[in-house]
Amino acid sequence: MRFAENNRISHSQLYRQMILEFLAPFILCMYGARKLNGINALIGMAMALIPLGFYVIVLIRMTPVFENLKKSGGVLVGQLTGLFFMVFILMAGGYILAVLGQLVPVSLITGMSEEWIAFWAVLVCMTGIRGGMPGRGRMAQISGGVLLGGMILMMILCIPQGKAEYLQDMAAAWKFSGQEIFDGFYGTICAFSAVGLLPFLLGNVEKYASAGKTVLAGILTLGGILMGMAVLLPAVLGYGRVVQERYPVLPLLDGADLPGNVLARFDVLWMGFLLYSLLFALGSLLHYSRQIAEGAGLGRGKMWTAVAAVLIWCIARTGKWILESFGWYLGYIFVPGLLICQIFLFLRSKKRHRKKGVIISGVLICSIMLGGCAGAVEPEKRMYALALGVDASEDGLLVSYGMPDLPESTGQGKEEENGSTRVLAIRGENFTQIEEA
């Protein structure tokens, strides 16, 4: 189905909305310093697409439940669930605004404060959601294909700039790491976690029960672009530079020119595509705030949208805080909470399974709360800084390594098992002898 009927969006419009909402945040924010880089992360990305494909089936079955949270979960449960998703709207919107505030002064307009950039961005997005879901569907129908084609063209133009030596260096430095693969896997799951809002949207899609292939196609398209960029960035910039840049795609855009020097600043065109996608994503979040508020019985949707816009602007003003804490929020709060909410509501909607839903949700909560966030390391296995001292005398050099007092550092009050000193001393006439010792 290509066109919408009865004020509902078509499958094609749904697919293009997914591209517009996810493409720029993914390309800008998933690579770089302390993010998903390297071969292990690439393996994790590919693995994450498999459970996401099955998750789409669950989301479609959850659509009737989320259309009226107050009815399916009860007044209290419905409102708490609605507030949980509203917090995600605020955090995600604040993060996108903070990214916009950093990109625009660097790439497009100088001398404009981040606060004013965020203000005008929110104002534009508030104006853009007045058409409701049909209006957003028409916007996606017109511009979604252009954005996707532009990003693919940009990647193709960057391929000739790649160097095989850079990829060989990355492959030579690669060591299999289960932890890094898991980080890439779970990081991709967290990035796609906004797909969990689809049940609020699918009620406005024509024949949503058959929209699974469309949503899956969107996930696979985005996943393919993600993995392609994970290879293209180190091939063009070098792996060492990628892991140091905050937004490594920005220097990549600088070299993506058409043959013949058609424009002096062709990177501005690519940046325009990315900024449009970020604004569309922000507008979608504001639109979803209205859908969630009305479905959860929180009050008037328009009022909540206005409140969400103000709070998003306030969160974006924190700048560094939201940029550093949003990933932690996704990994440790939103994704586990999303699974708990969906499992609980799905089983609660089946009256004969209500008791089972409470039990399973309780087990999940206990597993998350008592499991050490799935990444705890025993104090004895943690890495501690060593104190280094060098003494010079007529006999040569004396290098001393001082280890911390583990019982005092960890607060466990354990006695040392061997009772030996925790200082290692190495003597030599010069540093070469000490290194060989």
Predicted features along the sequence, with ranges:
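Hydrophobic alpha-helical segments and their helix-loop junctions in multi-pass secondary transporters
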Residues: 90-97, 101, 147-173, 188-191, ...
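Membrane-interface loop-to-helix entry segments
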Residues: 115, 128-158, 328-342
